[in-house]
Structure formats: structure tokens, C-alpha cells
């Protein structure tokens, strides 16, 4: 009875009178994912894969479940995580189970990440412990108590996802799946997952599990329309793409030498082997083509450049081959029919002995491309802020960022940076456009500055923007600035990455945009 009322409160379909097909696409907060997320937090083994945002919801969760920190389900989860049961694996397992507290198997454990949990018996044992955890902690009551909060999250996401993404995918891949569910995961961060459960008729219930990107007014946020569209296309695509290449492991392995030059970039994104990297390349090639077809050439090219900047060196060749698929659908009615042609592209690349220049990823105008560059990392802090106390606190904040995520970086004052050769460096600059003297000198290289200056909202406002390195235009810089020095403190909580700039108030995104190159210079798109 509790489970029924909970799902009635939070499982809301995308409904449009003009497009009934959208009713197939659901958005929910799923008690199974919230349960496993809570256990992940209690293990303290999942690092930045779980959200550390100090919200009422997270405080409620810790208050409720910390007394169960020593439960066998938590201890066993910590062990499993250390052996590879992490990232998407727990999510795949959870969608194979019924809602808590019953957690009954709906699929064979062998199809639910058992191999990453030490085998089917090991996974069954942990699921039994998790069932006991859910009952003893009365997780269902906790979930029901927060149903209003979940409904607010769902409504917020619905307002930013007006399109029938399921139709986009079915049209492109040439096949239909049983169901499509967007799962909002407010306790997760830094990762999104595409998982699936096979029905008796071989069709799939597919899930796109979307992590929170920031918090606004105490409610987890999941990005704007552009971010949600990309994530849904990407995560749902795994359920179409992965089975195709998983069924031909020998053919995929033939081109395994291509992993060597991109090993570091792939491993840093939790794609440690060629099989996984191939699936990721294929998905990103398809989402790039979807952007070209549905959003236009500019959006498609920007998407392709973003994937290339993320280290997916072969995505352009694969996306180019997909044009042949699109133009010959009578010969290739489904993606399944065309998949061997994509494997052949990788075989061809492997035979070429590609030079080092092929793998260079020049600055493409996005924050993400600036931050994924190799080379020494430099953090530039201000010395000329008018608010001295805020300047001191900002330096402390940047030192904290350095200790947590940029441990090998060097911190420079703006004055030191102005006399250094930083042409080979990855740069993060902090402070106001006047108080950081390095930013003050080079602010005209930031195309987003005029947009920031024209914002009408009451401040303080934040701007995170990419810009070219003034000493080497093939490299990028990330500027973390604001209308007041104090507002730069905590700025990493504002979601940023896939676009050229983000303007926000606290952690709420107000405006984003991209750049284009014009006569060798970057300008607003």
C-alpha cells in the first residue's frame, strides 16, 4: 500500500495532448535508486559519485540512516565497491529488483551486473542484506515522507524536457523498446547511467539515471534543457548500442590497439577497457548525429567537437560513417543492420598507424575542453580585490579546491601569473574581473563578458567562462568570476562544463551559451 501511494506521488509521465507518444517517456524519483544511493553514502567508498551538497534532504537521510551504518548491507557494499561494483553496476542491479522493501528479483542476477559483484550467489546475498536494511530502517516511510520534494524535482525536470526523446531514438535506431524512464537521482553526482531490463519478449525497459548537477532553494537540479536532452539521448542510447557490440567481442577486439593512445583519457572517465570505450564512442557518434539532424549543423558540430575534446578521438570518423546509414535506410532498416560497418571503421583506423597529431585536442570554445587539456595545471588567485576579507576567504577556498580535486596544481597570484610563461598550462583563474589582475588584463578575450554585464537580475551574479589562453590560442582557460569577490567562493557548485559560459546566482543557472570562431577569434554564437 505504501509503495503504491509513493509511486502515485512521484512517477509522472511526460504528457502532451499534441503528442500522445510522449506518454511513453516517464520521469520519476525511484525508491530503488534512492535506497542504493543512501547505502553508497554510508559506505564512504563512492567519493564524488555521491552528492556532498548540504541540503535538508541529505541531512534528513543521514539522520535517519546513520544508525544503520554498521548494517551488513553497508559493509558488504563497501567490499563490493572495492572490487569493481561501482558506477553503473549497482544501478543495473537495482532496476532488476522490485521496489523496497520487497526487492524481489525481476530478472536473472547474471543479467544484472553479477560479474562485477563476485558472481550471482554473491549478488543474491547482498540483495538479501539490502532487503533487511530497507525493512529495519523503514526506508519506505522515509521515501513517502519526502514525496512532495520528489514531485518538485520531477516537475522541474519536466519543464525543461518538452520533446519526445523516445521518438528521436526509435526513429534513428529503427526499433522500439518497451518503456523509457528518466530517473532523477538527487543523491548522486558526477555520473549518469544507462541501464536496462529485458522482458520475456526480448524488448527492454530502459532507464536513464541522471545525477544532480547543483541545488537551488534546497532542491536538487538536473540541468537545463540542453543538458537533459543530451543526457537522455546518451543514456538511453546505451540500451540500443551496447547489445550490438557486446554480441561481437572478437570483431571489436581486432581494433584494440586504438585504446593505447586514449587510455589515460578513457580511464579518467571510468572507461578502463576497449570494449567500454567502443560503446561510448558509438553512443557519442549517434548523439552527435541526432544533434545535427534535430538541432541543426551548428549544434551538431558543437556536440561533435565536445566529444572530441573529451578524448573520444575516433568519434568523428564514426559519425561520418553514420551518414551512410542515414542515407540508406532501405538497405539498413535498423542500427543492428549497420553495426558491422562501424566496426569496420575502427578496423580501418587501426590499420593506419595514426600519428600523435591525430590525438591532439585543441581548445574548442567550451569550459569542458579547457579543463580536459593536458599539461601543468595553474590556479591564479587575486591580489587586488577591494574586499580584503573576501579575498582572503577566496584564497582559502581555492586552496580547498586544490586539495580536493587539483592536487598536482600550482597556485600563483595574479601578479606572478602575469610574468610567467603559461603557454603550456591548463589555467583556472579566480576573482572578479577587476580584482584578479590577470583577468583584468585579458578579460577582453572572454566573449561572454558583455552578456554578463547586461544581466538585469539582482546580484551578486557568477560567471564561469572559457577563454583562449592569451599565450597559446590552441589552449583554453577557465575563468571563475563574479560581480563580488565573496560570490566566487563556492562557485564550483554552479553547474558548468558542456557550454562556453554559465551565468548564475548562487547555484541556480540563469543563462548559458556557446562560442564560435570567426577569423581566428572566439565570438558569441
What label would you give each PLM region?
Residues 109-113, 194-226:
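Active-site scaffold of zinc-dependent metalloenzymes
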Residues 23-52, 96-115, 294, 298-525:
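Solvent-exposed alpha-helical segments and adjacent loops
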Residues 14-18:
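N-terminal signal peptide c-region/cleavage motif recognized by signal peptidases
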Residues 242-269:
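Post-HEXXH active-site segment of zinc metalloproteases
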Residues 116, 151-159, 218-223, 227, ...:
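Second-shell loop/turn segments in exported
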Residues 147-206, 407-418, 422-432:
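Auxiliary, metal-adjacent structural segments of Zn-dependent hydrolase domains
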Residues 22-160, 198:
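Non-catalytic architectural context of zinc metalloproteases
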Residues 226-246:
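Active-site recognition of the HExxH zinc-binding catalytic motif
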Amino acid at each position: 500500500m505504501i509503495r503504491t501511494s509513493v509511486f502515485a506521488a512521484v512517477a509522472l509521465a511526460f504528457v502532451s495532448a499534441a503528442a500522445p507518444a510522449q506518454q511513453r517517456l516517464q520521469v520519476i524519483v525511484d525508491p530503488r535508486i534512492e535506497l542504493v544511493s543512501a547505502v553508497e553514502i554510508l559506505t564512504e567508498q563512492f567519493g564524488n559519485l555521491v552528492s556532498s551538497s548540504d541540503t535538508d534532504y541529505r541531512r534528513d537521510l543521514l539522520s535517519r540512516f546513520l544508525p544503520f551504518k554498521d548494517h551488513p548491507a553497508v559493509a558488504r557494499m563497501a567490499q563490493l565497491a572495492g572490487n569493481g561494483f561501482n558506477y553503473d553496476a549497482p544501478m543495473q542491479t537495482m532496476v532488476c529488483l522490485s521496489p523496497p522493501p520487497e526487492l524481489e528479483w525481476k530478472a536473472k542476477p547474471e543479467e544484472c551486473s553479477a560479474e562485477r559483484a563476485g558472481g550471482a550467489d554473491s549478488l543474491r546475498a547482498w540483495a538479501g542484506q539490502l532487503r533487511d536494511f530497507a525493512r529495519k530502517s523503514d526506508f519506505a516511510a522515509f521515501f513517502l515522507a519526502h514525496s512532495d520534494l520528489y514531485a518538485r524535482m520531477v516537475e522541474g525536470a519536466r519543464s525543461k524536457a518538452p520533446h519526445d526523446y523516445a521518438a528521436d531514438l526509435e526513429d534513428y535506431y529503427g526499433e522500439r523498446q518497451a518503456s523509457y524512464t528518466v530517473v532523477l537521482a538527487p543523491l548522486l553526482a558526477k555520473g549518469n547511467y544507462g541501464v536496462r531490463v529485458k522482458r520475456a519478449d526480448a524488448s527492454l525497459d530502459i532507464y536513464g539515471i541522471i545525477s544532480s548537477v547543483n541545488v537551488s532553494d534546497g532542491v536538487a537540479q538536473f540541468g537545463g534543457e540542453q543538458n537533459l536532452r543530451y543526457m537522455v539521448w546518451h543514456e538511453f542510447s546505451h540500451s540500443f548500442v551496447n547489445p550490438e557490440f557486446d554480441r561481437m567481442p572478437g570483431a571489436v577486439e581486432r581494433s584494440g590497439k586504438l585504446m593505447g593512445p586514449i587510455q589515460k583519457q578513457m580511464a579518467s572517465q571510468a572507461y578502463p577497457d576497449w570494449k567500454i570505450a567502443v560503446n561510448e564512442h558509438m553512443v557519442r557518434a549517434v548523439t552527435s548525429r541526432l544533434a545535427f539532424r534535430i538541432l541543426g549543423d551548428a549544434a551538431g558540430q558543437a556536440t561533435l567537437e565536445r566529444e572530441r575534446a573529451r578524448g573520444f578521438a575516433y568519434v568523428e570518423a564514426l559519425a561520418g560513417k553514420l551518414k551512410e546509414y542515414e542515407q540508406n535506410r532501405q538497405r539498413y532498416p535498423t542500427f543492428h543492420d549497420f553495426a558491422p560497418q562501424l566496426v569496420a571503421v575502427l578496423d580501418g583506423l587501426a590499420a593506419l598507424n595514426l600519428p600523435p597529431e591525430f590525438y591532439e585536442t585543441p581548445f574548442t570554445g567550451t569550459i569542458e575542453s579547457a579543463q580536459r587539456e593536458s599539461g601543468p595545471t595553474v590556479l591564479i588567485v587575486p591580489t587586488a580585490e577591494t574586499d580584503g576579507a573576501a579575498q582572503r576567504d577566496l584564497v582559502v577556498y581555492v586552496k580547498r579546491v586544490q586539495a580536493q580535486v587539483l592536487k598536482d596544481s600550482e597556485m600563483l597570484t595574479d601578479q606572478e601569473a602575469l610574468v610567467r610563461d603559461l603557454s603550456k598550462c591548463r589555467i583556472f583563474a579566480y576573482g572578479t574581473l577587476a580584482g584578479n589582475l590577470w583577468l583584468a588584463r585579458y578579460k577582453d578575450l572572454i566573449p561572454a563578458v558583455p552578456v554578463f554585464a547586461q544581466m538585469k537580475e539582482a546580484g551578486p551574479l557568477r560567471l564561469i567562462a572559457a577563454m583562449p589562453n592569451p599565450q597559446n590560442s590552441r589552449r583554453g582557460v577557465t575563468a571563475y568570476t563574479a560581480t563580488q569577490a565573496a560570490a566566487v567562493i563556492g562557485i564550483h557548485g554552479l553547474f558548468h562544463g558542456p557550454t562556453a559560459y554559465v551565468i548564475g546566482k548562487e547555484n541556480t543557472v540563469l543563462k548559458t551559451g556557446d562560442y564560435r570562431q570567426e577569423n581566428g577569434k572566439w565570438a558569441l554564437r
